From Swiss-Prot:
It comes from Xenopus tropicalis. Residues 1-65 are annotated as: Disordered. The keyword Phosphoprotein does not apply. This is WD repeat-containing protein 26. SMART domains: CTLH, WD40.
Length: 614
């Protein structure tokens, strides 16, 4: 923010750098039209305050700091937006502050009244304020249908004024067109906009609006609200970016700061697991934001015991309505998730996987499920989930080992492979489309581009393979075997379970190791971890010490250790649609469903969820 008493401009302008004045206050201001800022200078004039001022009764008012002045202006702007104009007048009178520079106030009023010639003349008065050293920053594109221009931040003053003039004339042109004044609009286009020699591409677009047959057509094509308060307020928001905040406050500045504070508190909350609501009415500003562990999926809601041997894998469907579990007992069980109670019930049992089921993959539309077996298994099963019928049982050779599978995003192809060097791309009928020789695959994932397949191999790395042009490249290199990995929804992050090391987070774009998560016990068993929670802010993994570990993505220390299983936890799956629902599969033959604590028996909850804040 600017210091008090900034030098006044040559044309007798008041200093741009001060929001508070020491002179006496006169008559109250007129109500403003817009943007939550008072439309007059509250009768104030003079220079910035330099010391304590005399108040009625002989008391000296303490000189306000720059922070105090800023807060008063923010409060005044907010109160004015609520229509409390008399309160604003009293606040400004007692504090000796003003909300904005008088030239800016005049400019604002002329814009909101649609007095374009006067607003254009006001730009001459604002030149010296734009030139102020406080009018910072770089030219960046602005968004919006009628705002393809750039907004400034360290552009020459003449260029800034030209950009502001362009915005004014554009609004003037559109309003003429909407009113049916085509000749006047054409005059603005030819004699005022075009001579500016600025943003000729936009001028070509504007000229095309002359062909609009009626006002609705114009508003639709221009993506413009039409003549009136809404479009003019948006115009003012854009124009304000060219002026320093000491001259004109950014619109709704206090709300912006409060919203940022709430978002920061939520971001720092280790247990925040719900959708962010940017509406300030949904939160209390009187206390800091904090989520209780009791709202987090740390409590066992169900124990599924229908499998009769070790459960090696579990995975929720993409729509979150089903859970598939695979076991050493040769079966896959499909469970239905109740959308209201979040309880699971057995829907279908798929049998006949002679070697057991160690990996499962849902098709993108959840209509199909592929099941793979352990190292000795040369077959995979493609099931129709709706009917429970086996569509394809695929095997290329009895010597194969097909232990991993991943769906192409189109849902019509999948890739599969294993540690004996098989790496195939197939269609839904199991027909071989492509193959890659000599790749000993541990785990697979198809990226959203529909071309690239990520594969971890026996060389402790993840490589990207393109089946279209048959190219491959190294992406991740670890020092120990990668037992499994999964990719975040946006394709940016990879979560690896590394033998003897634990859980590692990699940035695939920058190809760097981001974080090593502590606590988990990982030997040479295949353990599958997952991203989860709202916005995938959390990470969960099984462990050989019989626990489920949960971390916040940015914290190396676990925020929860979930107990209940009695043997190694092989896999954890977080429901992609219900952030408070999680499943874990264990060698103890059970699948545990985790959710928030019930309203009663909190003592039992604390025993099950031992949480450590980082």
């Amino acid at each position: 923010m600017q210091a008090n008493g900034a030098a006044a401009a040559a044309a007798g302008e008041e200093p741009a750098g001060s929001g508070c004045l020491s002179a006496h206050n006169g008559e109250s201001s007129e109500p403003a039209h817009s943007n939550g800022v008072l439309s007059s200078n509250n009768g104030l004039s003079g220079t910035g305050s330099t010391g304590p001022t005399e108040q009625p009764g002989g008391r000296k008012k303490k000189r306000l700091s720059q922070a105090d002045e800023d807060v008063i202006r923010l409060i005044g702007q907010h109160l004015h937006g609520l229509g409390l104009n008399q309160t604003v007048d009293l606040l400004m009178q007692e504090s000796g502050c003003r909300l904005e520079h008088p030239s800016a106030t005049k400019f604002r009023n002329h814009v909101m009244e649609g007095e374009w010639d006067k607003a254009e003349n006001d730009l001459n008065e604002l030149k010296s304020l734009v030139h102020s050293p406080h009018a910072v920053a770089a030219c960046r594109p602005s968004s919006g249908g009628s705002g393809s221009e750039h907004s400034p931040t360290s552009c020459p003053t003449a260029d800034v004024i030209r950009r502001m003039k362009f915005l004014l004339l554009q609004q003037k042109y559109l309003e003429y067109l909407e009113d049916g004044k085509v000749l006047e609009a054409l005059q603005v286009l030819r004699c005022e906009l075009t001579p500016l020699k600025y943003n000729t591409e936009r001028i070509h677009v504007l000229s095309g609006y002359l062909m609009c047959s009626h006002a609705d057509d114009l508003r639709a094509k221009a993506e413009w609200e039409g003549k009136g308060t809404a479009s003019r307020s948006k115009l003012l928001d854009k124009l304000q970016t060219y002026l320093p905040p000491s001259v004109m406050l950014p619109p709704r500045r206090l709300q912006t700061l409060l919203r940022q504070a709430v978002e920061l508190q939520r971001d720092r909350c280790l247990y925040h697991n719900t959708k962010l609501d940017n509406n300030l009415d949904s939160v209390s500003l009187l206390i800091d934001h904090v989520c209780s562990r009791k709202q987090f999926p740390c409590f066992t809601q169900q124990v599924l015991t229908e499998h009769c041997n070790e459960v090696w894998f579990c995975k929720f469907s993409n729509d979150g309505t089903k859970l598939a579990t695979g076991s050493k007992d040769t079966t896959v069980i499909i469970w239905q998730v109740d959308p209201d109670t979040h309880q699971l019930k057995l829907l279908k049992t798929l049998e006949g996987h002679a070697y057991g089921v160690s990996y499962l993959a849902w098709s993108p539309d959840d209509n199909y499920l592929i099941a793979c077996g352990p190292d000795d298994c040369s077959e995979l099963w493609l099931w129709n989930v709706q009917t429970g019928e086996l569509r394809t049982k695929m095997s290329q050779s009895h010597e194969d080992s097909l232990t991993s599978v991943a769906w192409n995003p189109d849902g019509k192809r999948f890739v599969t492979g294993g540690q004996r060097g098989q790496f195939y791309q197939c269609d839904l009928d199991g027909n071989l489309l492509d193959s890659w020789e000599g790749v000993r695959v541990q785990c697979l994932w198809c990226l959203s581009d529909g071309k690239t397949v990520l594969a971890s191999d026996t060389h402790q790395r993840i490589r990207g393979y393109n089946f279209e042009d048959l190219t491959d490249r190294n992406i991740v290199q670890e020092d120990h075997p990668i037992m499994s990995f999964t990719i975040s929804r946006n394709g940016r992050l990879a979560l690896l379970n590394v033998a003897t090391q634990g859980v590692h987070l990699w940035d695939l774009q920058d190809r760097v190791l981001v974080r090593k998560y502590q606590g988990v016990t990982q030997g040479f068993y295949t353990i599958h971890s997952c991203f989860g929670g709202h916005n995938e802010d959390f990470i969960a993994s099984g462990s050989e010490d019989h626990k489920v570990y949960v971390w916040h993505k940015r914290s190396e220390l676990p925020i929860a250790e979930l107990t209940g299983h009695t043997r190694t936890v092989n896999c954890v799956s977080w429901n992609p649609q219900i952030p408070s629902l999680m499943a874990s599969a264990s060698d103890d033959g059970t699948v545990r469903i985790w959710g928030p604590a019930p309203y009663v028996d909190n003592q039992e909850f604390e025993e099950e969820c031992s949480s450590m804040n980082s």
